[in-house]
């Protein structure tokens, strides 16, 4: 794992950037994991969106 140097006050910004990058990586790996038919993919996408909407 690489080390990042952050200036005081930029910790929050660096954390947000890390979370964004890690989420993109997770989505990419999940997307290429296996093939889903369009109907099932749509259902999964709606299910994941509802999970985030509930907060």
Swiss-Prot record:
Belongs to the bacterial ribosomal protein bS21 family. The keyword Ribosomal protein applies. This is Small ribosomal subunit protein bS21. GO terms for cellular component: ribonucleoprotein complex; ribosome. GO terms for biological process: translation. One of its GO terms (molecular function) is structural constituent of ribosome. Pfam families: Ribosomal_S21. The lineage of its organism: Bacteria, Bacillati, Mycoplasmatota, Mycoplasmoidales, Mycoplasmoidaceae. Keywords: Ribonucleoprotein, Ribosomal protein.
């Amino acid at each position: 794992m690489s080390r990042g140097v952050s200036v005081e006050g930029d910790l929050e910004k660096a954390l947000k950037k890390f979370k964004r990058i890690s989420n993109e990586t997770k989505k990419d790996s999940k997307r290429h994991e296996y093939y889903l038919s369009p109907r099932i993919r749509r259902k999964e996408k709606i299910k994941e969106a509802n999970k985030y909407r509930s907060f």
